[in-house]
Amino acid sequence: METFYTCRNDRAFKEVFLNPNNSDLLKALLEFILKIKIDKLEIKKTELLSGNVNIKDKRVDAIVHTGNKKIEIEINSQNKDYLHTRSTAYICNIYQSNASVWDTYNEDTDIIQVNLTWGLGRNNDEMKIYKIMNEKGELYVKNFIIYEINMDYYDKIWYSKNEEEIKKNQYMIMLDLDKKELKNMPKDKIVDKYITNVTIVNNDPEFQKYMSEEEDKKKIQNSLLSEAKEEGISQGISQGYTSGI
């Protein structure tokens, strides 16, 4: 049986939400997270500085343009120590690229990063907002904003079986539900369309092939790292004996 990839997976998320035909799904999700009304959005390639393309392992993602905002979305399936450093590097690159477009430096365009992160803990806050400011809370710039969304918080709501809360938070909850769980979700046109599209993506042989190859690469990489670590430990022990330690 083929694996059903939820939108906790970066590739699956992009296939569903960055599809131009699914702009209504992306709009509904961002409106819920940012608590704003979006009249129109446009998905554009990231304007990365040429010298920093490797920052994304040579993959250029998309940025959502809406009104005076440029929004980047990061899918973090696990919470790792390096995440904040990496995410900061991404948004700083976008911030610098945006500043390079204009003849003058200004703060007219909000540069926003939305991190959908699993592994932060179900009992922690649902969201944290980060800005650049001093110890008095005075902003250094007003248009640099990072949202860190605790996706475990929404998993907790799902397993609570509180129908009212599930309905209220359904656009977040649906992102990591498997095929069987999605059938039990309260439905509206957004949820219905999401279910249809994430199913179509998972039924695509090319997508499944890509995901299988990616998982195989990760397994090989993890195996090589494990072997290197074991070899390093063995060498260290051997050198210790040789040195009389």
Annotate each language-model stretch with its function.
Residues M1-T3, T66-N76, I173-I245:
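Short, charged alpha-helical interaction segments and adjacent helix-coil junctions
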Residues M1-Y147, D155:
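Accessory alpha/beta interaction modules
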Residues D10, K14-F17, L26-K27, E31, ...:
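Generic detector of well-ordered alpha-helical segments enriched in charged/polar residues
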Residues V16, P20, I33, T117, ...:
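Generic structural signal for hydrophobic core residues of well-folded globular domains
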Residues E31, R59-D61, K80-Y82, T88-N93, ...:
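Generic alpha-helical propensity signal that fires on short helical segments
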Residues E126-N134, N162-N169, E213-E215:
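Short intrinsically disordered coil segments
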Residues K142, Y147-D192, N197:
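An acidic, glycine-/histidine-flanked metal-binding catalytic module
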